[in-house]
Each structure stands twice: as structure tokens, then as C-alpha cells.
Amino acid sequence: MDKNYGRVTIPTDADMVEETKQTAQRWGADAIRDCDGTQMPDALKSMPVKIYSTYYTTRKDNAWAQANPDEVQQVYLMTEFYTAMEEQAPLRIPLMKHLYQEQLKPNTIHDIKRWWEVIDRTTGEVVPAAEWDYEEESGEVVLHKPGAFHEYTVSFLAFIMWDPVHMYNFITNSWENVEHQITFDVRQPKTQRHVIEKLKQWLKDNPDTDVVRFTTFFHQFTLVFDEFAREKFVDWFGYSASVSPYILEQFEREVGYPFRPEYIIDQGYHNNTNRVPSREFRDFQKFQQREVAKLMKVLVDICHENGREAMMFLGDHWIGTEPFGEYFKEVGVDAVVGSVGNGATLRLISDIPGVKYTEGRFLPYFFPDVFYEGGDPVKEAKINWVTARRAILRKPVDRIGYGGYLKLALQFPDFIQYIEDICNEFRLLYENVGGQQPYSHFTVGVLNSWGKLRSWGTHMVAHAIPYKQTYSYAGVLESLSGMPFDVKFISFDEVLENPAVLDDCKVIVNVGDAYTAPSGGSYWKNPALSCPIKAFVAKGGGLI
């Protein structure tokens, strides 16, 4: 094989036929793809390359979503804290204050007294359903007899009327005259049947597609916008938008206890990755992972039966897929592609077990927030490449690629040249690694509440975007991603069950703010954890 050919995927568009051919030749690309907002040209389908087709299971079908409003995806939200002043009755709590009205709509189709919850945050007690009502016209919950100077919140279900990823792309690209895409819930019966049949027909209608690039499967990570269409709350690992009465009733039957909104809301922390997970939230995660894997397998099997590969994008509607969890390996996904923002996010992809190959979508994405007059996409590409390159030398992805509008990138010739250099350098590095295990001084164990499930992602909030409160801790994992050590992610529960899980480590790293999931919080009160760690150190092991 030509050393300057292969292992690279590039984006295309309907009006970029010759430009795609020229770029593919320069970069040595052996695969082309469409993206959100672009279209695969028929003229390129006969090229001697793999054709990736982006496939959306949860959106781009507004006719279905509008005809089945009860099966639109939902998210659990919590209002701000509202204080009842002395002798104030009733207390009125607006649900949608500081939320983007076009994105979300309170779910009043299902029983609100069953699926919503009003909590006295001063005492921690649930307000009986008989003591509050909802006024749909004003959008307010009304508490009839609040306690003086007590604080209250309302936890409620809302329909996702504008897919948050589509909304982000819409805003970033200043799209006009583009219909807002509604997110529908593939887990629910009618929609599930519709999506399965739609995929079968789509495969018949698109015989030139080699790889179905699922973007992604069923549940969006938590991404909520404020009244100014800015990101208000984001948790790349968040399960808050993987809920519906249908799913929650299934969950109740499995676990044998009634569901409470608070199991998701978690005092407003939304069970983000820094929270030590409760038993109920772990139960919910495990249930979701198993059910998501079962339905994923149905769609993946359909692809295989039609002679296509199934690739999963690690992002967007990826919640519940959990590539480092116990069910993912049973699905049969051929490949995983994900965005590479740094070394840790590269390892988040390249370390995934049980797939035929992995692919890193490098940055910058070809969007106008970077590719504008006066912009410097070469600088962003250099930072991205140099940051991730250390991790490639430890555990490379099998392929790299880019996404977005090729026409924007072509306006920057220096950028096109630099990416050509990156592609050639990547192929050289990959060939030199040659599938071998690089030298390692010893194994470092990263100890936290999550273990393998959050491999390389312990301190991530919005993927690779730095977050002030976790930036330094994330730097520890970023360093480890390219250092000459094997890295093993261990949970506190694993140590409690079998302390011998530490035996192949020479150093244990436990980093994070006090009382958080990365550091452990109350886990350390248990001598069944602290004593084995002390014994590990006494025998010569290191503890950071």
C-alpha cells in the first residue's frame, strides 16, 4: 500500500464533487462521508473509496414526531429554588424561567402528579401532590400552603421539541429556513417499529453505502439551553434525557421499587459524573445500558444482514451505549468514531474493546466558528494534533478523519497543506507502532467511583472543553494518556469486593475534590477500602 494513502476519512457535499476528489488525493483519503447539513453527491458513489452515510435514528423525521407527540423524547428538569416569604400563600413557581422555550415543552400528556415532584428543599421532604397544582396557561406550579421562608423546587418532565445537537449546529452555522428537528424516543413501541422499518427501507434505497455511521442511537447526553440560546447545562455523560413514563414504568417493574424524579434530579446536580452515584441511579444506569444494548443490536444486525458495517459515533445520542460497560461487546458494532479534543479523548476512543477498528474525528470541525475571514484554523489543527499525538504513540486509533463543510476548509490553502502533513504523519506513526504494545514501566491504577465505565472520562463535563473546577484533575488523565505506563481504571466497589484487583498496579492515583465521585467521599469511611489501600502502600505501592 502507498504509504501516503489510506486510514483517512473526509467530508463531502453535493456541490463539492471535483473538490472532494482532489482533496482525497492530497490527503490520501480512502473514505468519504456526509455530515449534518451536507449531502453525499451521487457522482462520488462510484469512487474507489468507502462511503460513510450519517444515519440519525432519533431525528430528521418531523412528520413522525408531530404525529406521535407522546413519543417525543423527554428530559427531567428542575426549577430554580424559590423561597416562600412570610405569610406568602400561594407560592407560584414558573417552570420555564431561564430555559429556551423553543427547545423544551413541559409534559402534561402524562400524569403530572405521578411524574413530577415538588420538594421542600429546606426539609428535604416531598410536598404531597394534593398541596400543589399546575396552571398550564401561566406555566406555573402553585403551592397552596408553603412554609414561611422554606425553599421549594419543582422537578418535571419536558418534551425535547428541538434536538439540542441540531440546535447547536443551527446556531453555529446561522442556518435560515431550516425546520427545527424534533427528537423522538426510539425506545417506545410505535416509534421503535417505525425506526426499524425505516432503516430496512433506507438500506435498500442506499445500496452504495458501505458504512452506516449511526449518530448516534437513542438518548442525547444532557444539553439544555437558556433563554438566550446559550448552553445552560451540559453533561456529556448525563442520563437526564433518557427518561419517559414508558421507560420508567419498565424500570420500576425490574427493580421492584417506585421511581422518584429525585433519582435523576439529585438536588439539581443531575447525577453528573462528579457525584458519588446513589444505588438508585446505578440501578437506572444498568437498566438503561442493558435495554439500549438490546435495541442497538437489532439495528446493527439489520445492517449486517444487508452487507453493511455499523459504526457508532461516540457522542450526541450515545447515552446508555457505554462502550466500557458490560453490554456493549454483545452488540456487534464494527467500529466507533469519536471527536478527538486531546490525548484523553483519543484514548477514550482507541481503548474501546470489542470493535474491529476505531476512528478519531480530529478538530477543527469545518464550521464557520473557526473558518471565517481572519480565523486561524491551522493554529487550532496544530494544537489538536500535537495534543493528541502523544496518546497515539501509546494506543493509536486505526483511522483519522474530519467533518463539516469542505468548501469552508478549501478557502484556507495553508490549512489544506497542514492536514495533508498530518495525514501522512499519522500513517507513519500507525505503521511504526505496527499493532505492538509500547514499552511500559508499570501499571498505574486510577481509583474512583466509576472504574472502567468512565475510562479516560472521569473529569469530563462537555467532552474536551476545559471546565474550571476539574481542569487540573483532567490534566492528570491527560498526562497519563501519553506516558509510558499501562493505565487501569478501578472502582471502589471492585476493591471492596476483591482487594487483589490492586495487585498488578505499582501506583494508585485518586484525584478529585473532596466528597466527589473521583475522590470517593464516604467510601473512605469503610475500613474494607481504606485498609487494603494502606496495605498496598505498606508493601511498596505508591498512592497519589
Tell what function each PLM region has:
Residues 8-50, 197-215, 328, 335-338, ...:
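Catalytic domains of carbohydrate-active enzymes, especially glycoside hydrolases
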Residues 71-330, 348, 434:
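Polysaccharide-binding and catalytic clefts of secreted carbohydrate-active enzymes
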